[in-house]
């Protein structure tokens, strides 16, 4: 993937950044694509860096993700909860599966979606081959993860665990308005009012 370079004029002349580093200067993290251990580690490093820079200033996590590995997503989620800096979440395009879970885990009152974004929740996916005993062990672990994710999603959305269990039995798609009613986000935004941008 080609990453754009941004050139800025400073008192010392020109300085070039890749676009993600430039966004980081404004406390913006962009989570685009599937969530795996590599992506998770990069997001966590950025969260920790911004926390160290200013623990009282908001961090803006933009999400455009189909989801990914549960443990990788949970590492991001736990870091969001661990740091003092409030993490605002913004869905751009789609937040599905673990992407939707992270969207819901943003600071209450600061979870947003753009007008035409799609949000989807479902139960964890897993596939494993091997001996019957090993398959049973992994099936039990998936059930434990499912229970934990349902409990946390219920906590963040205000829905009952029973409703979350029923709705995540299959892919459950939502518009921004649906996600707001459901409690996954707090507002739909059409203009950038959260990071100081204007048009």
From Swiss-Prot:
Subunit structure: Fourteen ClpP subunits assemble into 2 heptameric rings which stack back to back to give a disk-like structure with a central cavity, resembling the structure of eukaryotic proteasomes.
DNA-binding among keywords: no
Domain of life: Bacteria
Primary location: cytoplasm
Species annotation: Geotalea daltonii (strain DSM 22248 / JCM 15807 / FRC-32) (Geobacter daltonii)
GO BP field: protein quality control for misfolded or incompletely synthesized proteins
A single Gene Ontology CC term: endopeptidase Clp complex
Active site: residue positions: 97 (nucleophile), 122
Family, per entry: Belongs to the peptidase S14 family.
PROSITE patterns according to UniProt: CLP_PROTEASE_HIS (PS00382), CLP_PROTEASE_SER (PS00381)
Pfam families: CLP_protease
PANTHER family reported in the protein's UniProt record: ATP-DEPENDENT CLP PROTEASE PROTEOLYTIC SUBUNIT
Broadest EC class assigned to this enzyme: hydrolase
InterPro entries: ClpP, ClpP/crotonase-like_dom_sf, ClpP/TepA, ClpP_His_AS, ClpP_Ser_AS
Protein known as: ATP-dependent Clp protease proteolytic subunit
Catalysed reactions, as listed in the record: Hydrolysis of proteins to small peptides in the presence of ATP and magnesium. alpha-casein is the usual test substrate. In the absence of ATP, only oligopeptides shorter than five residues are hydrolyzed (such as succinyl-Leu-Tyr-|-NHMec, and Leu-Tyr-Leu-|-Tyr-Trp, in which cleavage of the -Tyr-|-Leu- and -Tyr-|-Trp bonds also occurs)
């Amino acid at each position: 993937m080609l990453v754009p370079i941004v050139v800025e004029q400073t008192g010392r002349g020109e300085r070039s950044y890749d676009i993600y580093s430039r966004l980081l200067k404004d406390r913006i993290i962009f989570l685009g694509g599937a969530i795996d251990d590599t992506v998770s580690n990069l997001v966590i490093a950025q969260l920790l860096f911004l926390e160290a820079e200013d623990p009282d200033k908001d961090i803006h996590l933009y999400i455009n993700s189909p989801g990914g590995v549960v443990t990788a997503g949970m590492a991001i989620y736990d870091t969001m909860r661990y740091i003092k800096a409030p993490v605002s979440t913004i869905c751009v395009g789609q937040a599905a599966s673990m992407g939707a879970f992270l969207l819901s885990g943003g600071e209450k009152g600061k979870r947003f979606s753009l007008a035409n974004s799609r949000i989807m929740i479902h139960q964890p996916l897993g596939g494993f081959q091997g001996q019957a005993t090993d398959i049973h062990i992994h099936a039990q672990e998936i059930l434990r993860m499912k229970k934990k994710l349902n409990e946390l999603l219920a906590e963040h959305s205000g829905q009952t665990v029973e409703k979350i269990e029923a709705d995540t039995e299959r892919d459950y798609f939502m518009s921004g308005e649906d996600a707001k009613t459901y409690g996954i986000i707090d507002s739909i935004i059409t203009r950038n009012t959260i990071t100081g941008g204007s048009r």
